[in-house]
A protein has these predicted regions:
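Nucleotide phosphate-binding site architecture
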Residues: 13, 23, 150-151, 193
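Short glycine- and hydrophobic/aromatic-rich loop-to-beta-strand nucleating segment
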Residues: 141-145, 184
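Conserved alpha/beta core of the MobA/IspD/sugar-nucleotide pyrophosphorylase nucleotidyltransferase superfamily
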Residues: 1-2, 151-202
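Nucleotide and nucleotide-moiety/phosphate-recognizing core
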Residues: 2-105, 109-139, 171-178
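A broad detector of the eukaryotic-type serine/threonine protein kinase catalytic domain
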Residues: 43, 149-150
Length: 202
């Protein structure tokens, strides 16, 4: 059973004064960590959807070797919102994929084993949605959606994501606990500062 991996990295970084995905962390750009996490997980293929600053990001990512090939896809309509990037990711996956794990590109602390835990839960239960939660049960990323939900994901518009699909079936959603520290996303300057301080970086 094949599960695809989609890294969503097309955003405008609107809440930061600079392109966040290229900010340095542990000697690499933030996005490198998310892509490496996905490429090292039991998913195939891995698609990274780019948009804002795609030329620069592409040139940087191509200097790295990942555990498996990473397909770089540009979302020409990235300014219209997150839904268009989800759609590009889905359209980039082969028909053989039974589902896909979606991961924002600004989560540098997640591990391949965390993605693997979602895949394992899906393979064991067949649940149409498997989501990461922290120790308190709060919804987090990544999220695995079965192919049966791809049409509904592809029909989303604007800044809609799969949040609504998750909420409407929350009691039946399979939850996989991931340590809170690892599901941190970096979407503000303050979040980036806290990330660096937690690592002892200036």
């Amino acid at each position: 059973m094949e599960i695809g991996g989609v890294v969503l990295a097309a955003g405008l970084s609107a809440r930061m004064a600079r392109p966040k995905l290229l900010l340095p962390f542990r000697g690499h750009p933030l996005l490198w960590h998310a892509v490496s996490c996905m490429a090292g997980a039991p998913v195939r293929p891995v698609v990274c959807v780019l948009g804002h600053g795609s030329a620069e990001i592409t040139s940087i990512l191509r200097t790295y070797t990942f555990p498996q090939p990473v397909l770089l896809r540009k979302n020409e309509g990235y300014a219209s919102g997150r839904a268009s990037s989800v759609r590009v990711g889905i359209e980039s996956l082969p028909e053989s994929c039974a589902g896909a794990v979606f991961l924002p590109g600004d989560m540098p602390l997640l591990r391949s084993e965390d993605v693997g835990a979602l895949v394992e839960r899906y393979e064991r239960t067949g649940a149409p949605i498997v989501v990461a939660v922290d120790e308190a049960g709060n919804r987090a990323h990544p999220v695995l959606f079965a192919r049966s939900l791809f049409p509904r994901l592809a029909a989303l518009t604007g800044d809609e994501s799969g949040h609504g699909l998750i909420l409407e079936s929350w009691p039946e959603v399979e939850k996989v606990t991931v340590p809170r520290r690892r599901v941190v996303d970096v979407d503000t300057e303050e979040a980036y500062r806290r990330l660096l301080e937690s690592e002892g970086e200036p």
